[in-house]
Every structure is written in C-alpha cells, then in structure tokens.
C-alpha cells in the first residue's frame, strides 16, 4: 500500500505520526495539513480496529504507535483508546475518522484539514 513520505525520513515520519496519533486520541479532533491528515487517517482506522479486539497482543501492537502518557490522574492514552473510543465503534466496520478540508494556512497557503473521530 503506497504512503506519503511527508518530506521526512523513516524515523522522523514515524515520530510525527506517533505524536499526531496520540494527540488525536487525547483531543479527538485536530487541525493539521491535508497530507498529514490523510496519512493519519490510515493509522487511526487501524488503531481503532486493533482496539476493538482488546487482547494483550493488540494492546502491545497499539502501544508501538502511541506515546502512552497520562491524560489525567486516572487515564492513559492507551486506556482511552481501548475503553472509550473502541466502545463507540463496536458495530461499525470501518471509517472511524473523517477528514474535513478547511481554508489554507495563512502564512504559506498550505492546504489544511480537520481530522476527527466520527
């Protein structure tokens, strides 16, 4: 499956997507460039599919793509993914996120988009 390099090498691209994926789970909606949103959408849909299985193996697979930091005193990012987000989509077979195009960025005119969970 082809993917966008996002103007970065492999390690930088992984770190960027990992940070964006963590932010998306915490905030449930973020505004980023259109190309980053399209790449993040692929990863986010895979993560929700993993979280619906809810086994030890899928938790470890999901942890590879997240920074498992604390959101508040009780919850971590991984717990929010596996408890809150996956429970919303138990009867849904895919298409967990939506990319909405917005106005270009003011400084350089880069096409922007909002990615959010449906």
Swiss-Prot record:
Gene3D superfamilies for this protein: Ribosomal protein L17
GO biological process: translation
Keyword terms: Ribonucleoprotein, Ribosomal protein
A cellular-component GO term for this protein: large ribosomal subunit
SUPFAM superfamilies with a match to the protein in the record: Prokaryotic ribosomal protein L17 (SSF64263)
A single GO molecular function term of this UniProt record: structural constituent of ribosome
Entry-linked NCBIfam families: L17
UniProt family annotation: Belongs to the bacterial ribosomal protein bL17 family.
Assembly with partners or alone: Part of the 50S ribosomal subunit. Contacts protein L32.
Database matches in PANTHER family: LARGE RIBOSOMAL SUBUNIT PROTEIN BL17M, RIBOSOMAL PROTEIN L17
Protein's name in the database: Large ribosomal subunit protein bL17
Taxonomic source organism: Onion yellows phytoplasma (strain OY-M)
């Amino acid at each position: 499956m082809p993917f966008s390099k996002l103007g970065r090498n492999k390690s930088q691209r992984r770190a960027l997507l990992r940070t964006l994926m963590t932010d998306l789970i915490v905030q449930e909606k973020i505004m980023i460039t259109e190309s980053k949103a399209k790449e993040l959408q692929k990863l986010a849909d895979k993560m929700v599919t993993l979280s619906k299985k809810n086994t030890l193996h899928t938790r470890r697979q999901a942890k590879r793509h997240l920074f498992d930091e604390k959101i508040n005193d009780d919850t971590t990012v991984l717990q929010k993914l596996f408890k809150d987000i996956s429970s919303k989509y138990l009867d849904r077979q895919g298409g967990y996120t939506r990319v909405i195009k917005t106005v270009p960025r003011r400084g350089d005119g880069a096409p922007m988009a909002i990615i959010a969970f449906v």
